[in-house]
Amino acid sequence: MGCRKLFVSCVLLSCARYSFAVEFNSEFLNIDSDDHVSLGQFTQAHYTVPGSYVVDIVVNQRYFGTRSIEFNNGGSAQDSYACLPEALVATFGLKPELFESLPRVADGQCVDLTAITNASINYAQNLGRLVISLPQASFEYDDPNYIPPAAWSDGLDGALLDYRVIANQRQSTTSGNSTVLQSYGTAGLNIDAWRLRADYQAQQDSGSQGGRGNEQAFQLNRLYAYRALPSIRSKLSVGEDYLNSDVFDTFALRGVSLSSDDRMLPPNLRGYAPLISGLARTNARVTVAQQGRVLYSTTVTPGAFSIQDLNSSVQGTLDVTVHEEDGTEQTFTVTTAAVPFLSREGELRYKVSAGQPRLTGKGGTEPGFVASELAYGLSQDWTLYGGVLAASDYLSHAVGLGKDLGVFGAISADVTTSRATLRNSAETVVGNSYRINYSKHFDAIGTDLRFLGYRFSDRTFTNFSQFVGDPDAYSLNAGKQRYSVMLAKRFAWLSTSLSFDHSTYWDAAPSDRFGLSLARSFAVGNVKNINVNLSAFQTRNAQNRDTQLYLGVSVPLGGNSMMSATVQRASPGATSTSVGYSHDDGEGMNYQVYGGMGDNKYVNAYVGKRASTYRANASATTDGSTYRSLTGEFDSSLVVTRYGVTAHGNGSNGDTRLLVSTDGVPDVAFTGQARSNRDGYTVMDGLPAFQAYEARVNIEKLPLKTEVSNPIQRLALTEGAIGYVNFAAAQGYNAYVELTQANGQVVPFGASVQDKHTHKEVGIVGEAGITYLLGAKAGAELVARWDDSHLCALAVLPPEDVVTNIPTPVRCL
């Protein structure tokens, strides 16, 4: 028995020690001669015939897009390897020192990842997937959503225009008639990493409402240039800007700013976006502005609304105006979240600005100033931070501590001291302001605590806006206390949200705003997704006390149609009720009609269209006797690059976007509303900056005879970039052919038929030259390759409309 075990062991060891190439006996194949067989690519396990292959890139089970990878000859005739370009490897997020130390091969064109201990690269040919496995210690951060700076793209040089046009005509027996035409937007120019932006507003009023005649106004609210500095994870801005500060109150400036950009940091150290909620009585337009500059505008339907997609860099106090269709307006302010200024251990973050304040009012002053702030990460997740703001006759300095509490969020506390010589009295006053901030999203209990902050200021504390401002233009009431809370909680049967803003002043009445929303979804019999919403908002200040209550019920009717009923109560004011019907066709078109009664009976009709190149809507309201209102809105954007002019739907404030090419194939749909135009281009807008973004083809909506070999592309863009990706789309047909060479012999079994220019494989030659071509495009140049050195070009392919089960002879010359 022992000898037998020893014999078996020796055999197994010898098998493990030696590995021979697989040899095929072509006699088992039904072919005429070995000369017509090319089986070299099948003789070695894991061997890939050199050439270009479109593959899915997977690194540690994370998808990194689909792209063409070149396989090169290795050290022997039976060896090949995947050439991984630096630009691709840079997106993996390796530690910078490791990435720089990796060997470059093939004249520096390829990065050798196998130099990393325990790394492996395997090409699963049957799946078209290049699987890369790397030790976790190789990565700079263990975060699947973090993309390293080396992988960020500045995009294309080009120009852009985001614009919105709103027209309203109102006829009223009580307030007169008016016609208002408004437009606002952003024009921009991208040159390398620089972004030049100009925000504009234009308005023309005519009519008798309010005693107005014809009025026209045009202004550039902001003209500035900026660029990302990835090497120091900072943003440089020149021109008209706003002080971006975690320590001091924000104000408009004209000058230069250099600051760390937390969007370049790992996601867990990035800020929260502001949340704005309220109530609309009609199809209203909600405008969010800061010191006269429109930051955001949208149309909302009657009832409760919530705006959560403002840029996370927006800070300070925002002015929100709800423009109702009957001409009335409601306004309120929202204090945006101030996330604690945290830094990792040993990291220094900074913000420096110099220039002059602007928008200070007619009687204001514009002294030169310098502002700077620093934050340094200490051990045990502590951060020490502070800042200085200095101008002639003014000095303010702050110091504070922040702490990362891990699963419990983050907290900070600071004190700011100001010393100012007042212009009107030449008196020098000194005061302090104390602040505590806290923020956290509690995933475990399904609660989002957007912001909780408290600030107390002495009577003699003076912020910079108060120091330079005009008392006739801006309120210089000295703030005493201020705090804000935004809380959302989802239960199994109920969703709730709560917001509260409170401000008190030393020489003025306090102001408060309270909001509460409750939402419930349930089923009655076979009718599912019945929604009930209850909202209450109250605003209190020295001038008025406004309370609004809203109750809404919506019942789905099937086929994307819905009935709804609402009851609203405004105090002071009357109670109004409405009943409506709405429908969405699922392709971007929606409309609604509803009627109701309040002070008067009224009826409203609305229609909206969301296309890949524009957004448009129109609405009409009348009570049949005292007023009529007609409103239209059109939003669109233009991108101009070396690829031409491309229109797309509603970019915003010159934000980041992606120009997509589909190789001239029209009507290719992508996730969302984007769809390639007749020239094969489209634009995806609203992309996050410095983060991974996946552009995806909607395979289910591909046109007939169209295929895309790389339906998913992954990239990361810098702020304001016009990115570019190409999807290898093709419109073609299938063909059944018999391939023969110029000497009359058939093309060898196993040869690969590829597109001459893209190297995309469209078929593999079978027995007797019989080949089934998939996705062949009329007029395409196809070649057959075998044995690494043999190549012939296919002559004329059979016509597209010929369908037969008999192979069509095609010469390969």
Set out the residue ranges of the language-model regions.
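Short, ordered, surface-exposed loop/turn motifs in non-cytosolic proteins
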Residues: 49-71, 284, 664-674, 743-758
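A short, amphipathic beta-strand motif
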Residues: 57, 276-278, 658-662, 733-742
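Short Pro-Gly-centered beta-turn/loop motif in secreted/extracellular proteins
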Residues: 75-84, 310-315, 681-707, 719, ...
